[in-house]
């Protein structure tokens, strides 16, 4: 079954701009937001390593993946060109993202900020393989 079929409502929770407290992500508030979202039948979440300097992924782990069964939500992450220089850098980066998010897989994995120049970089380093 496609992950598209698992998205319950056509609205997603982007984890790019999160509640802050004392210069850090306010996980207490974020957990409340995640709970509110899930309780209303929404289940699609979107993050990227660059959001909050990698801490958005940690927030996913602390407020979503450690608190809800994996099959209850759909999670998207992204490959950002600034985090790899060679093809060999891509897999360790991907595995770090899985670990930081506390999951074994992503439902969707996007090439972040596509443009012609970055498309060529992704192709050159076999990111589409």
Language-model regions, residue ranges each:
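Structural motif corresponding to the early beta-alpha repeats
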Residues: 51, 67-87, 112-115
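Active-site mouth loops of central-metabolism enzymes
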Residues: 16-28, 78-88, 119-121
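Glycine/proline-rich, positively charged
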Residues: 35, 85-129
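Solvent-exposed, non-transmembrane amphipathic alpha-helical segments
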Residues: 33, 62-65, 79-80, 126-129
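N-terminal binding-site loop/beta-alpha segment at the start of enzyme catalytic domains
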Residues: 1-73
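Proline-rich low-complexity regions
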Residues: 9, 80-81, 100
């Amino acid at each position: 079954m496609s992950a598209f079929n698992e998205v319950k409502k056509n609205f997603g929770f982007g984890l790019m701009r999160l509640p802050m407290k004392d210069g850090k992500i306010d996980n207490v508030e974020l957990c409340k937001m995640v709970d509110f979202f899930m309780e209303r039948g929404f289940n699609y979440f979107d993050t990227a390593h660059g959001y909050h300097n990698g801490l958005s992924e940690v927030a996913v782990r602390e407020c979503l993946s450690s608190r809800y069964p994996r099959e209850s939500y759909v999670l998207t992450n992204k490959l950002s060109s600034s985090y790899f220089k060679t093809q060999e850098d891509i897999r360790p980066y991907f595995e770090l993202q899985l670990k930081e998010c506390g999951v074994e897989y992503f439902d969707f994995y996007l090439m972040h900020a596509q443009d012609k120049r970055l498309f060529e970089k992704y192709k050159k380093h076999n990111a589409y393989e």
